[in-house]
Amino acid sequence: MKQPSLIYLTGFSGSGKSTIGPLLANSLGYDFVDLDQQIEHLAGKTINRIFTEEGEAHFRDLELMVLQNYSGKSELVVSLGGGLLQNDRCFSLIISTGTLVYLHSNPLVLAKRLSHKSDRPLMKGEDGQRLSRDAIEQKILNMLEQREPRYKTAQITVETDTKRIGTTVEELTRKIERYIRRCEKKQLERNTKQRKQ
């Protein structure tokens, strides 16, 4: 059953999911889980190592397994990996169980934010060498072209480019609370209609 208070945060790497997620959970009075951290804990290794040693297919299986642990919960904010929605099974599970929130950022802003993080696979080419800023921007644009259609299925979208984090969290809190109230009202109307039949 769909739980509007099960919040899935999505967005490209560098959009602010790991920073905003715990603050949003605190603002809503919910728990917080970073799915990538849970996968690393389960596997006993970093996501980079999982990809390198066991391949993407194994990582996607782990992703689904960990996601399923949280899909029946409520009052929970789950930070998703930037590419998770490309996993069809994960995408279907998310759409059917909770509320998807998209943290949108301009590709140039993402490139600037990510250029300071050397541990991200996105920052490296196939040869393992660090990419130039232009190459990072192009890589982001190419990946967004693939990911954006699923990001845009989110019930709630917030821009994270220029706002302060606190302002973004306040805006998200208002939008989520409003969305949950609308969902509850629709459910109440459906229940009332069914009882009358």
From Swiss-Prot:
Its cofactor is Mg(2+). Binds 1 Mg(2+) ion per subunit. Substrate binds at D36, R60, G82, R147. The keyword Transit peptide does not apply. CDD domains: SK. It catalyses: shikimate + ATP = 3-phosphoshikimate + ADP + H(+). Mg(2+) binds at S18. Its EC number is 2.7.1.71. GO terms for molecular function: ATP binding; magnesium ion binding; shikimate kinase activity. ATP binds at G14, S15, G16, K17, S18, T19, R120. It is an enzyme of class 2 (transferase). Monomer. Catalyzes the specific phosphorylation of the 3-hydroxyl group of shikimic acid using ATP as a cosubstrate. This is Shikimate kinase.
